[in-house]
Amino acid sequence: MSLKILDPYLLDSLNFMRNKESQLSSYRGKSPQLNKRRLLVDWTCLSAEEMSLPKSSQHLAIVLLDRFMDSHDIAIESLHFICLAALSLAAKFDCLESKVPKLSHLVKLLDVPDSCKPAQFRQLEGMMMGHFKWNIFIPTATHYVELLREQILHPTDLLEGISIYDDYHEVDDRLLAFVTYFLDIAVQV
């Protein structure tokens, strides 16, 4: 599929993301914890929503979680810590500093909040960053949607032969809701 993109910045960004994707090692899906993934993804998404983090942070956290679990045999009781560390790293990468959750807020999401000391959590984040060679920009579906959203719909588009100009914002909101729905499903797969 080829897109006709005229904006050179957008084209450069798209090419950069495609290049980053091509450099990723293959995801093997061999994690011993794979049977827990669905629960971990649900918990991570709910935690991200509770902290008002954007979808891009949720998706990046889940990609980090998947890829980290794919290479490590993690004790069941540590999986939620890994989720929180992935969420923290994704937020630090993806959000303004004011939106990055504080460690004290993160550990409140755990069943046993006192079980995670700040030094242990920072060490876990460091271990994860080391695993990713300190490069956690992994393009996700949400990054592509954010990048291409303005290319998808334009006020001069027609709907059943009628201009959407007067209803552009309503159509755009519906489109975003529809895309968000599919992004929520995609993260589960």
Where is each model-derived feature located?
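Acidic, Ser/Thr/Pro-rich regulatory low-complexity segments at or just upstream of the first helical elements
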Residues: M1-L84, S88-D167, V171-Y181, I185-V187
